[in-house]
Amino acid sequence: MHNQVVIIGGGPSGTLLALILAKANIDVLVLERMTKEYVLSRIRAGVLEWNTVDMLMKNGVGKRMSAEGQVHEGTFLSSSNKQFRIDFKNTINKQVMVYGQTEVTFDLYKELEKHKVKIIHEVDDVEIKDLTKETSFVSFKDKDGKPNIVKSKFIIGCDGFHGVSRSHIPTNKLKIFEKVYPFGWLGVLSETPPVSHELIYANHSRGFALASMRNENLSRYYIQVPNSDKIENWSDDNFWEELKLRLPTEASDTLITGPSIEKSIAPL
């Protein structure tokens, strides 16, 4: 195989870049290690800054987002059981869009299909070769275990911190700037109405909490937990009880709880 550009990683960054290149008539191939079903169902972040919204709209993937997404003109911060609102619109003339990464990725895949961009899923043993030469190579095994080699002028890594691309940066060129916190966010997704029409970021002596949403009937909540904690330690009832303690009273008094449909811990 031969492509002008090979993108490793079929998430939103890789697929948006693939779309931009395809619209510029650049031949591009996307390699993704997970199944298409997994990529289109995984739960990730749900709030988009407006420059991202503009970029999606500019590249033809904003129609469903405009119809189903929620525009927020501010957010709430709380501490010591008091909350106040930061008005984005009046302060900096900006907004944010609540529209889940799952939905963004779905829209991007649909648009890539129109442009006939090839995405190969379930690739394994990906290796990048001859990076410093005029033509580079990517080798991989497909889902049937068959070896493949792709020639390319440009190879772009969009496969994240744990992806194979990062490991190919020469050690003398790699600079790492990071702060690792001793805690993570325990997140719960539930088919319940959001507790607030805008997000609530809560500071509490027991730890941080966030009240977010995906739509008017799908809520996303987080609480800060130690990195050593396990999902098995948290029943739904325990999570809701702890969340109520950390949210301001005016929110916790109206919180509607229900069974979780997804639960995970994200390290920070």
Mark where each language-model region is.
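Active-site-adjacent segment of FAD-dependent monooxygenases/related oxidoreductases
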Residues: 41-45, 49-115, 132
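Conserved FAD-binding catalytic core of PHBH/FMO-like flavoproteins
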Residues: 126, 133-149, 153-268
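A conserved beta-strand/loop element that lines the FAD pocket in flavoprotein oxidoreductases
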Residues: 113-125
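Beta1/beta-strand and adjacent pyrophosphate-binding region of the FAD-binding site
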Residues: 1-13
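Glycine-rich FAD pyrophosphate-binding loop
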Residues: 22-43
